[in-house]
């Protein structure tokens, strides 16, 4: 963390002491029986500790240390990203939040989102999300997803040939990001040229970090870098949008070929079409959601398969049975995906131990009582995946890697939440499943590997990532399966 950044936080905190005093008196006067907890420093609250625990590799510490302190309560108060927050933990809390979407709570994003996605200031980030959810079902329905599988397989093959084959050592995380970003560009924008894809792929790391950061727009801060990166990507997207408009008018592009064409040609309920900034921001959000979480999952699949040879052997056996059933040049299809039951159990266990989505915020629409505590209107609520994923009451021996947890009906409801839950469950969950399984198929049938840094630190910012990118030594199989067309 840059020295001037820390100094800036301290200075801002000092200037906010009077505001904190007035706020404390106002809250006390209202007489709420609030959850136990503390609000931390003025303005920044406990944001630094909340974020720094992730940077240091143990994001669950912020949650579990407070749960232990306020036991048996499963809810505590804090202040994060400039907001008063009730952190709600456990399956019962998850059920309450997911079941009361649109009734007692609504989705909420930090104010930093409005800076990075400026079109959302015209309405609100919540309204923008609603619009997106109306646009997405066509592209994530089963028949559409089935059509994507051969395309995903083709891109995975090309990615392996370009980035993995012929190399003895690689860093997994950057390559996983290239794979998932290439897929998102191909399926959302019909961009298939790796050079074009690479042109605006790099800034996405800064965008994701900026979204969940302390919203201080000073040079060098994560928030400032996120804003700058989003502007770079947005300009590139506007160029793509202008060209697509020309291609559609000249019949060089299809109205149904991808999400971009759909956005350009579909009016809202009032007959109005989205402008270029609206479309650029929505595509930007899709590209972030469409590749960031899946790339983290793919990376940790590689990590755990390197650490657990018996798990690797089970995945290898399943994937080789599928590979050997294919004709030369034949791509994966829906039936093949349905056979990858053990592989998906492994991926699910990976996402239990390293959830790509660490948690999410809601906003209280009105005052309500929960577990004997008053939650005031306007307060933010935060649910944490780790509060159940690493809870022995939900998953016995939670640190043990056990894909069998997902056999049969799987974990109890509201305990396994890597994609959220309720009406706000990630609409791209099935899309993510496909890109993860296609990745597993293509890497396992080509290689075994070993980690080059046995105890590499895992950082969370905002998703879990290996601090050094997960360098591995590749060991190609002696008799690789033919994959060329």
From Swiss-Prot:
Mainly expressed in flowers and flower buds, to a lesser extent in young leaves and, at low levels, in old leaves, stems and roots. Keywords: Glycoprotein, Heme, Iron, Membrane, Metal-binding, Monooxygenase, Oxidoreductase, Signal-anchor, Transmembrane, Transmembrane helix. It is found in: Membrane. Soapwort saponins possess anticancer properties and are also being explored as enhancers for endosomal escape in targeted tumor therapies. They may also serve as precursors for vaccine adjuvants. It catalyses: beta-amyrin + 3 reduced [NADPH--hemoprotein reductase] + 3 O2 = oleanolate + 3 oxidized [NADPH--hemoprotein reductase] + 4 H2O + 4 H(+). Its main location: membrane. Heme binds at residue 426. SUPFAM superfamilies: Cytochrome P450. It is an enzyme of class 1 (oxidoreductase). CDD domains: CYP90-like. It is a single-pass type II membrane protein. Pathway: Secondary metabolite biosynthesis; terpenoid biosynthesis. The keyword Membrane applies. Its cofactor is heme. Component of the oleanane-type triterpene saponins (e.g. saponarioside A and saponarioside B) biosynthetic pathway, leading to the production of natural products with detergent properties used as traditional sources of soap. Belongs to the cytochrome P450 family. This is Beta-amyrin 28-monooxygenase CYP716A378. It comes from Saponaria officinalis (Common soapwort).
